[in-house]
Amino acid sequence: MTVFSALLLAGVLSGLAFVVGIVAGIRLSPRLIERRQRLANEWAGITVLQMLQRIIALMPLGAAVVDTYRDVVYLNEQAKELGLVRDRQLDDQAWRAAQQALGGDDVEFDLLPGKRPAAGRSGLSVHGHARLLSEKDRRFAVVFVHDQSDYVRMEAARRDFVANVSHELKTPVGAMALLAEALLASADDAETVSRFAEKVLIEANRLGYMVAELIELSRLQGAERLPNVTDIDVDIIVSEAIARHKVAADTAAIEVRTDPPSGLRVLGDQTLLVTALANLVSNAIAYSPGGSLVSISRRRRGDNIEIAVTDRGIGIALEDQERVFERFFRGDKARSRATGGSGLGLAIVKHVAANHNGSIGVWSKPGTGSTFTLSIPAAMPLYQDNDEQSGQPRGCDMWLNRPQREEEEFKSMTPAQAMMQSEVTRGNVNDKCPDCGGRGIAG
């Protein structure tokens, strides 16, 4: 091959390569463009400004930027929700703080509830902070506010608790001091000494009982995990609660009557549940006239087990029924002093129920009596896959036989329970089977 032929061949090959490159580029260009665009989008993301705006919008603080003319140039939704800004106008208290901030001071303030804009939520306690936005540009101040309502409520509850405890402990301590003085003054009178010594012992026991209940209530309110969760026989809980107050019932000639053993079971801490039910039994005995009846019944209602304690006592006024589970609340203070009540028993019941994912309810009528119903989740669901194997009726069988079962339950109720159940039934009627929607066919 001559030199000329070699050069000619090289030129042809180069031309072919150029043409092939152009054709390949034309065919691949859409893919390359798409890939480059995708990479550009991935690397671009959101801008820093967009990121900051998003953070400010999502944070729980209310934020607003105001200028020297009181014009709000920036704000987030929380600023309006917490009452800092309304109709682009800064709250008066916040504006006074912002004016000081524009002068170079960092200022803290509180939004006054009475002057909070109507658009803000009620019942809030809002604390704020104003400062200069930039030292180089002193035309703008930034104002932050946050909701501290939970903290304020907690502090108020703590103060009330301390005040209540101080007052309640002062009574037995003062009584023991007076009795001790009387003992010293009657040292030569054996009969008087014996009488006062018995009263000192009563007050000392009352004080010790109150301290123990305070410790128990504090532990329950601490939301600690239940220490000993087991599958518990409800009948054992009932029998142990009655046994704790058998002497008190016998002394007052009060009969504590229960329905037949149920075989029902709950999942929880046996000691706590016995304590809760025993507190209900103790109250029923304490607020019932001598020779009357206190009854205890248990039944399954949905996925919960209900234990009801009914007395034929003095009853609870309607305005007091919402407060009976508060610490130290006692509707009949004179009766409570006579019975030695601490005012903590029902509060303990409430927290025991809550710690078991249950509830406590009350029905009462002055002059008729009261029914307290403790509801605790059952150890096993009501409808199970092995209902047929266990011999238990399936969901629809139980639903179709509901009128007969409810009539039998109604007959076994006390008058107070029957009245309460009638009220509940009238307000909660559902004639459709939860399993089949009313067709009468399970599954």
UniProtKB/Swiss-Prot annotation:
Pfam families: HATPase_c, HisKA
Encoding gene per record: senX3
The protein, known as: Sensor-like histidine kinase SenX3
Subcellular location: Cell membrane
GO CC terms, sorted: plasma membrane
Membrane disposition: Multi-pass membrane protein
Catalytic activity: ATP + protein L-histidine = ADP + protein N-phospho-L-histidine
EC number: 2.7.13.3
